[in-house]
């Protein structure tokens, strides 16, 4: 499986320049069993949770905000990422490589979803900065039309940045891995890892840190409770993302150093492979966490889930569902009144999930 970043091969031994064998069979066996179970769980929860987010955003009759556009695309990125996990599970269990076209396509979806999720979380942070810190100057520019245009640009950027990760991927020796030209054999894996560390972690972290530092400073001077509640949700999404991806990026950086023989001993190589397996499980689970964050911190999303549950229960029991719609409409009118009282906080605070 082309995980980030060294490909996950199924070989039981790793050889250094002196042809000394390092046994990794027990780690490979652990990965085959544990990762297969873990991928199945992440796929199930990630699919259901992110589909609920998509339904909540697309089925609402209320007008959308630019924040909703970004949250919708974040959920779609997570769905694209999680959709590849059944194929990697099959690959781990059967030890059979995917068809060449499916190998390249699945790897492409994996990395496009990976970078797309990171980029949209970064864009959401920038949007929060504009909505809170530069509210007066950015109000006219934070429209749904602008959100759609920016989202298309983000998807294009994700495809462009992901292309080095899958352009050389093919089925080789019954495995799905990178088959690089001889001139790129040594440098291309290093460039791939560096791209993930820099564009997928360091640069977004710097941007988000700046945006949220300025946002926190602004919130200290503004006691608008509605605005603080909106920031709590978005900030929670960002913090959880980096808590789950930081260990993996550290291991990827160490894997890059391994190409330059920084870890010559077999024990260090084994520790690094164990760390890769463990941090990978933590990192990949991020794609099913955002819906739970919405349910925990987003009042409107919890309300939508209750409404959906009551509607399904009413259909199963043969009861009418008008009461639920009436209550929802009443609350929507209350939200509209609150929005009119706090209109200066800009359009972004009117997200359907916040």
From Swiss-Prot:
Entry comment on modification after translation: This protein is not N-glycosylated which is unusual for G-protein-coupled receptors.
Disulfide bonds: 103-176
Gene Ontology process terms (BP): adaptive immune response; antifungal innate immune response; autocrine signaling; brain development; calcium-mediated signaling; cell adhesion; cell chemotaxis; cell-cell adhesion
Primary subcellular site in the record, as a coarse category: membrane
Location in or out of the cell: Cell membrane
Residues with PTM Phosphothreonine: 345
Protein's UniProt keywords contain RNA-binding: no
Molecular functions per Gene Ontology: C-C chemokine binding; C-C chemokine receptor activity; C-X3-C chemokine binding; C-X3-C chemokine receptor activity; chemokine receptor activity; CX3C chemokine receptor binding; cytokine receptor activity; G protein-coupled receptor activity
CDD domains on file: 7tmA_CX3CR1
Parts of the chain on the Cytoplasmic side: 61-70, 127-143, 217-232, 299-354
Membrane topology: Multi-pass membrane protein
Keyword annotations: Adaptive immunity, Cell membrane, Disulfide bond, G-protein coupled receptor, Immunity, Inflammatory response, Innate immunity, Membrane, Phosphoprotein, Receptor, Transducer, Transmembrane, Transmembrane helix
Top-level taxon of the source organism: Eukaryota
Tissue localization of expression: Most abundant in adult spinal cord, brain, kidney, gut, uterus and testes.
Regions that span the bilayer: 33-60, 71-91, 105-126, 144-168, 197-216, 233-257, 275-298
Keyword Phosphoprotein: yes
A GO cellular component entry from the record: neuronal cell body membrane
Role description: Receptor for the C-X3-C chemokine fractalkine (CX3CL1) present on many early leukocyte cells; CX3CR1-CX3CL1 signaling exerts distinct functions in different tissue compartments, such as immune response, inflammation, cell adhesion and chemotaxis. CX3CR1-CX3CL1 signaling mediates cell migratory functions. Responsible for the recruitment of natural killer (NK) cells to inflamed tissues. Acts as a regulator of inflammation process leading to atherogenesis by mediating macrophage and monocyte recruitment to inflamed atherosclerotic plaques, promoting cell survival.
Family: Belongs to the G-protein coupled receptor 1 family.
Protein name per its UniProtKB record: CX3C chemokine receptor 1
